[in-house]
Amino acid sequence: METPNPLTLSELPHDLLRNIFNRLSFADFHRATWNSISKQTAPPKTKSPWLILFPDEGVHGCVLYNPDEDRIYKSVRDFSGTIFLANSGNWFLVMDSKSNLYIIDVFSENRIDLPPLESLLSDNFTFEQKGDKELKWQASNDQILVFRLPRAEELRGILWVDEKMKEFVAVWFLEDSCNFLAFYKKADDHYSHIQLEYVITDVFQSVSDIVLHGCFLYIGVGDYIQIIDLSKDQGFKDVTRNYLFNVHNGPWGFRSIFNLVVTTSGEVLMVLNNLYEKNIESEKSFRIFKKDPNPDPNKHDNLLVEVDSLGNEEVMLLDLGITMHGIEPNSIYFTRHDRVVHRLYIS
C-alpha cells in the first residue's frame, strides 16, 4: 500500500491555514507573510513593546525580547561590529564596521543600503570618512573654519518608516557639541543638510532633543524648538513659526531634564523627568506639559499647561519621543541606566 504524499502548507484548506496563523507567535507570523492567507489574517496583537538587548556590549550581536511571551529571539544575522542607531517598528538604522549606513528589517533579510556619508550636500558642512572608525566633520563660512575628527561611535540617528506607504526618512547627527543634522529620504542619492538657527557662531551648541514623527522633525536647540517639514520633493521647509513653543516658559529649573514627545495627532509635549530627584515610585516622576490652547493675551509666562492624562488609547514611548495607540493605555515606557521600567502610570 502506497503512503500518501504529505500536503504542503500552501495546499491546506484556507480555514485551517487561518486557524494556524492565528496561533503563531508574532515572529513566526511575520516569517509566514509569504503566504497569501497570512496576509488576510490579522497579526497577533502585542501588549508591550519589544526590547532589543545587546549582550556583551553588542560584540556578538543582539537579541529581541518579547514581554508578552517572556521569550527571547536570537537573530541569525551576524551583527559583529554593527552599531544600532535607531529604529521604527521592526526596521533599524544601523552602521557597520566600515561606517556604512543601511536600514534592515530584523525579522527578515530585507536591507536598504544608504549613500556614503561623503554624499552630504551642504553650503557650510562637509563630511569625510577617515578610515573605518574615524570621521572628519568640517564647518566653514567666509570668516572661519572649524573641523572635528569624531569617532564613528559618536554618530546618532533617528528613523521613521511607513510600511503601508513604503516610505522612510532617516536622520543622523553627531552626539556631542554640534548643531549639525542631515537627512535622507527614499530614492535620494545623497544626504541633505538641515540648517539650524546658527551655522558658526554657536556651532558647539548641542541639540538637546530631537524627534522624527512622519516627515516632521522636531529639534530642541537652546531655548526653542525648531520644526522642519521634510515632505518636500526637494529640500525641506522650516515651519517653526507655525508652532511657537518656548521651552523656558515651563516650571523647571536650568538643570531640569526634559524630553520632546509628539503625539499621534502631531501635538508637541514637554516631558519633565524628575527621576533623578524623586523616588521612581513617585506619582510625579514625570510631569507633562503642552502649549496652552487658550493663553492669556495679557501674560507672557503662562504658555504651557500641565497634562494630567495621555488619554485612554495612547501610550508614550519616551525614548522614541512619540505616542501610539494600544499596548498599555495612559502609560510611559522608558529606559534609565539600561534598566527598563514597565507600565509607569501617570494618572
UniProtKB/Swiss-Prot annotation:
Domain of life per record: Eukaryota
Span of domain F-box: 6-52
Signal peptide (from-to): none
Stored InterPro entries: F-box_BR-signaling, F-box_dom, KIB1-4_b-propeller
Protein name as annotated: F-box protein At2g14500
Taxonomic source organism: Arabidopsis thaliana
